[in-house]
Amino acid sequence: MSRIGKKPVTVPSGVTATVDGQTVKMKGPKGQLQFIVHDDVDVKFENGQVRVAPRSETKRARSLYGTARAQIANLVEGVTKGFEKKLEITGVGYRAAMQGKNLQLALGYSHDVVYQIPEGITIAVPKPTEITVTGIDPQRVGQVAAEIRAYRPPEPYKGKGVKYAGEFIFRKEGKKK
């Protein structure tokens, strides 16, 4: 049995939760999110708490209900606080800038890369070498950050490229004569 799945998700004041069959909806100060729980997992909302339990004792149901509980906890955190991912740009001439509703990246190519920001995601550029991705859905925030990083992942010799804040880049030694 999952230790995470056994804990109920407490819904704070200011957040309204509705459970309609297998769909869990959260509405809070930052917005609204929903999550469809797998059929092998049972969801109940009572006394300001969302409880998750496996419908049967199969391995699949037991493995899914801890995940469902974590996803529901992410809904609560997303509509109250939101999620944030920071990226750092390293390299001579590498920089980022906002261009209207798009993110413009100079990453050493012959042209600038223009990234269209999807709906529900906010990107800020406090410095030309820092990018902050924020939103209420952790999956979308992580996906956008990964897409930006994929334009120029950090290389192991000089560490040039786009990396997550706090990410360790394994460095290699260059060729020897």
Swiss-Prot record:
Swiss-Prot/TrEMBL keywords: Ribonucleoprotein, Ribosomal protein, RNA-binding, rRNA-binding
Matches recorded under Pfam families: Ribosomal_L6
Gene Ontology CC annotations of this record: cytosolic large ribosomal subunit
PROSITE patterns: RIBOSOMAL_L6_1
GO annotation, biological process: cytoplasmic translation
Presence of the UniProt keyword Mitochondrion in the record: no
Gene Ontology MF, one: structural constituent of ribosome
Signal sequence interval, chain numbering: none
Keyword rRNA-binding annotated: yes
Domain of life the protein comes from: Bacteria
InterPro entries: Ribosomal_uL6-like, Ribosomal_uL6-like_a/b-dom_sf, Ribosomal_uL6_a/b-dom, Ribosomal_uL6_bac-type, Ribosomal_uL6_CS
Family per record: Belongs to the universal ribosomal protein uL6 family.
Subunit details: Part of the 50S ribosomal subunit.
Stored NCBIfam families: L6_bact (TIGR03654)
Function: This protein binds to the 23S rRNA, and is important in its secondary structure. It is located near the subunit interface in the base of the L7/L12 stalk, and near the tRNA binding site of the peptidyltransferase center.
PANTHER family membership: 60S/50S RIBOSOMAL PROTEIN L6/L9, LARGE RIBOSOMAL SUBUNIT PROTEIN UL6M
UniProt-recorded name of the protein: Large ribosomal subunit protein uL6
Annotated source species: Bradyrhizobium sp. (strain BTAi1 / ATCC BAA-1182)
Record gene name: rplF
